């Protein structure tokens, strides 16, 4: 495995957002290359525990080099965190969950993973190459209308129908298997070019999100967090594009408001208690400073949102 450099975005801020207790139990739902996990471990005492999760086999290989009895790694999607926690009898005892969403720099920089239009490689895009359909397989079998919907929904691509038609026509002639081929087809089908962005940017994002069910993963993990967090436990979540951040922002806002009851609706105290109260308290958001963006341009679009589990 090549050693691709990865600079962890908002490292200190995300871990500080967890408000680490030395004897606490924490989850790093996106281990990656271990930047957040190592910092969390450095702040834990002997009684502390860190459960890390990743579905990328390369990340698992890195995690297995950490020889620390307080640390354990799980190969799987973070959407199943409630199951992992229940297996260890930690339900309701988790003091913090950190998620660093999206694709990592090592994944983007490794041409063999097929995430980037900047490097020619197999058209794969799977976070876990051992499971599910690759991007090439999906694009070769999907209907034109479905491809267009994915590009529009997950890439916010205004030329989605044109690009989908071009992809289907190209695959009919000769199936695409390389990232360079897809990038060229998209560029040729895009009538108006953005001088600041490669024409394939939105298509690659959309296909990657679809192949990995990324938004569903986020929604399920957020929902599960409410059942596993202890009162006062923290959520610290880094997003990299508007679709991710929209889901996180909406979830934290809704759970911070509690049940919405029409004004003037007659209710007994027992009925109000049955509805429950606020599940979370939103603690705000942070964005990278100029220095971090200058040192790591990929940090530019990142947003960190932090929330705390209430006693509800």
UniProtKB/Swiss-Prot annotation:
* Record GO biological process: rRNA base methylation
Q: Name one GO cellular component term.
A: cytoplasm
EC number assigned by the record: 2.1.1.199
User: What are the UniProt keywords, alphabetically?
Assistant: Cytoplasm, Methyltransferase, rRNA processing, S-adenosyl-L-methionine, Transferase
Q: Which Gene3D superfamilies match?
A: Putative methyltransferase TM0872, insert domain, Vaccinia Virus protein VP39
Task: Write down a Pfam family by its short name.
Answer: Methyltransf_5
A GO molecular function for this record? rRNA (cytosine-N4-)-methyltransferase activity
What does it catalyze? cytidine(1402) in 16S rRNA + S-adenosyl-L-methionine = N(4)-methylcytidine(1402) in 16S rRNA + S-adenosyl-L-homocysteine + H(+)
Where found? Answer: Cytoplasm
Question: Enzyme class, one word?
Answer: transferase
Binding-site residues, S-adenosyl-L-methionine: 34-36, 54, 78, 100, 107
Its domain of life?
Answer: Bacteria
Q: Which family does it belong to?
A: Belongs to the methyltransferase superfamily. RsmH family.
- What's this protein's function? Specifically methylates the N4 position of cytidine in position 1402 (C1402) of 16S rRNA.
Q: What is this protein called?
A: Ribosomal RNA small subunit methyltransferase H
**Protein species of origin:** Salmonella choleraesuis (strain SC-B67)
């Amino acid at each position: 495995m090549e050693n691709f450099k990865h600079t962890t975005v908002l490292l200190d801020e995300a871990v500080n957002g967890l408000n680490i207790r030395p004897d606490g139990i924490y989850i790093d739902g996106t281990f990656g290359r271990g930047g957040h996990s190592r910092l969390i471990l450095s702040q834990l005492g002997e009684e502390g525990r860190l459960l890390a999760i990743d579905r990328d086999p390369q990340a698992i290989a890195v995690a297995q080099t950490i020889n620390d009895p307080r640390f354990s790694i799980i190969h799987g999607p973070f959407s199943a965190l409630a199951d992992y926690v229940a297996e260890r009898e930690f339900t309701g005892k988790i003091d913090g969950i950190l998620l660093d969403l999206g694709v990592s720099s090592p994944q983007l920089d490794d041409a063999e993973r097929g995430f980037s239009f900047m490097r020619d490689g197999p058209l794969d895009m799977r976070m876990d190459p051992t499971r599910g359909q690759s991007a090439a397989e999906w694009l070769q079998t999907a209907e034109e209308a479905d491809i267009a919907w994915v590009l529009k929904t997950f890439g916010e691509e205004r030329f989605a129908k044109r690009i989908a038609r071009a992809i289907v026509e190209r695959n009919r002639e000769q199936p695409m298997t390389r990232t360079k081929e897809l990038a060229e087809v998209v560029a040729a089908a895009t009538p108006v070019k953005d001088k600041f962005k490669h024409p394939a940017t939105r298509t690659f994002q959309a296909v990657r999100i679809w192949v990995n069910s990324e938004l569903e993963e986020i929604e399920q993990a957020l929902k599960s967090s409410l059942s596993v967090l202890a009162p006062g436990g923290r959520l610290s979540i880094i997003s990299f594009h508007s679709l991710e951040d929209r889901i996180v922002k909406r979830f934290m806002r809704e759970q911070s408001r509690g049940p919405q009851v029409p004004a003037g609706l007659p209710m007994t105290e027992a009925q109000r208690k049955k509805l429950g109260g606020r599940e979370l308290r939103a603690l705000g958001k942070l964005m990278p400073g100029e220095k971090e963006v200058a040192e790591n341009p990929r940090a530019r679009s990142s947003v960190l949102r932090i929330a705390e589990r209430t006693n509800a």
